[in-house]
């Protein structure tokens, strides 16, 4: 027993010595200071993490502002022996493109438009040209003088331009040429020209995609489906080989982009009668994703809905709003300030007429288009008729809604007002 107790004492002594040695080493280690807590201070508790709200999307970059203004050029020719008798009206619209921050691309486009003007005026392109038209008009008038026949004496050639899309990616123009040289009705045709807004290059169908065969097949199939399922194209059932007739529309000059999508169209008489006119097929942009290159699709838009307000220019203090352009619809009219409140897209200004049979306005002339306006204004010179308004401003809001408004005058106090085109009805 004594031996056992002795052994226990030996082990205990050894453990004590080891512990002392360990304590000496621990004492040499510097420990961080403990936090001091006041007696009255409650310990801080870590709050439960709150769900952070989804970050608001950044507004989409607006890109370079694109403005297209249209100037009309008109020549009037009268009979050589009767200044009161008009025998020819020869006119054409000239679009002028301005791209903020990219004068080089705008110059390329404007040079091509100048070439189109020259071809139309001289008659070396499609159309007779002013000299050929005047010669025909003089021959027609001479026949009338010699025979006294009851014939139409006024010939005409008119080329108008519709701005179907203008943004930082694409500038798309549709030229409509109408000629009348006697007979029951005149003749007309459309021609589409689409430009790359970054370079000014005139686009062709094969430049829309890296896989033209797949693109071509998709477009033909889409048109064929529309023709079979949409009642708008019911008359096309009479065409014997409809697939071949539709595939022929995949050609240069017979397509353009507008706010809705890719449009392909026929010539008059090609698919239907003169009364039915030009047949158009629209393929929405949503259907063109992964079919054409993404850069040709419209940019995604974000932000609140914008709107317009109008006032007399004389009532607007100088320097109170940024004026980006001046648009003259009628040089003898009032000078107005048309201001965008917030951001609006695809702004266009056009002359219109009201059709009683459809209870809608249809465009008679394009004046101006702009890719976007944000808290800025234009000076607008226009007449305001006493009756039905004849000038329409169209624009798209951030959510994609297309709006059409008219400028009119209040019957109560004579102030300049904006009215919704959808709310207008003819009286009487």
Predicted segments — roles?
Residues 1-11, 21:
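Positively charged n-region of N-terminal signal peptides that target proteins for export
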Residues 21-35, 54-313:
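Compositionally biased intrinsically disordered regions enriched in Thr/Gly
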Residues 363-406:
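Short, solvent-exposed, Trp/other aromatic-anchored flexible loops in extracytoplasmic proteins
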Residues 311-315, 321-326, 404-428:
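Extracellular beta-sheet/turn segments enriched in Thr/Pro/Gly and aliphatic residues
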Residues 201-234, 339-374:
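The feature marks short-to-medium sequence segments in extracytoplasmic or secretory-pathway proteins
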Residues 308-357:
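Short, surface-exposed binding/anchoring microloops in extracellular/periplasmic proteins
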Residues 35-57:
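Extracellular mucin-like PTS domains
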Residues 16-19:
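C-terminal motif of bacterial Sec signal peptides marking the signal peptidase cleavage site
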């Amino acid at each position: 027993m004594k031996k056992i107790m002795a052994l226990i004492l030996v082990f205990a002594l050894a453990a004590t010595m080891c512990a002392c040695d360990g304590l000496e080493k621990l004492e040499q280690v510097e420990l961080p200071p403990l936090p001091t807590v006041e007696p009255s201070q409650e310990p801080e508790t870590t709050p439960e993490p709150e769900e952070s709200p989804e970050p608001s999307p950044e507004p989409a970059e607006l890109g370079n502002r694109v403005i297209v203004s249209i100037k009309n050029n008109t020549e009037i020719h009268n009979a050589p022996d009767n200044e009161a008798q008009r025998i020819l009206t020869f006119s054409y619209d000239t679009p002028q493109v301005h791209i903020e921050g990219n004068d080089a691309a705008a110059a390329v486009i404007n040079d091509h438009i100048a070439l189109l003007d020259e071809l139309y005026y001289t008659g070396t392109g499609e159309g007779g040209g002013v000299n050929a038209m005047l010669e025909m008009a003089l021959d027609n008038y001479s026949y009338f003088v010699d025979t006294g026949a009851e014939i139409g004496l006024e010939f005409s050639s008119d080329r108008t331009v519709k701005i179907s899309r203008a943004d930082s990616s694409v500038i798309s123009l549709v030229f409509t040429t109408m000629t009348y040289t006697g007979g029951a009705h005149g003749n007309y045709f459309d021609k589409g020209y689409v430009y790359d807004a970054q370079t000014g290059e005139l686009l062709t169908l094969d430049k829309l995609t890296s896989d033209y065969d797949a693109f071509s097949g998709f477009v033909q199939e889409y048109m064929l489906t529309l023709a079979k399922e949409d009642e708008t194209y019911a008359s096309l059932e009479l065409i014997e080989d409809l697939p071949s007739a539709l595939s022929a529309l995949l050609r240069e000059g017979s397509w353009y982009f507008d706010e809705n999508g890719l449009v392909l169209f026929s010539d008059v008489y090609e698919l239907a009668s003169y009364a039915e006119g030009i047949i158009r097929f629209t393929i929405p942009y949503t259907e063109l994703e992964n079919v054409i290159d993404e850069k040709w699709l419209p940019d995604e838009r974000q932000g609140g809905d914008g709107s317009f307000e109008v006032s007399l220019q004389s009532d607007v203090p100088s320097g109170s709003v940024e004026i980006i352009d001046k648009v003259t619809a009628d040089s003898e009219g009032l000078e107005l300030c048309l201001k965008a409140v917030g951001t609006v897209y695809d702004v266009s200004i056009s002359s219109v007429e009201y059709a009683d049979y459809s209870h809608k306005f249809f465009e008679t002339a394009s004046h101006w288009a702009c890719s976007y306006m944000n808290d800025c204004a234009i000076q607008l010179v226009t007449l305001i008729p006493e009756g039905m308004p004849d000038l329409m401003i169209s624009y798209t809001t951030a959510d994609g809604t297309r709006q059409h408004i008219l400028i009119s005058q209040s019957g109560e106090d004579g102030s300049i007002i904006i009215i919704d085109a959808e709310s207008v009805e003819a009286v009487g």
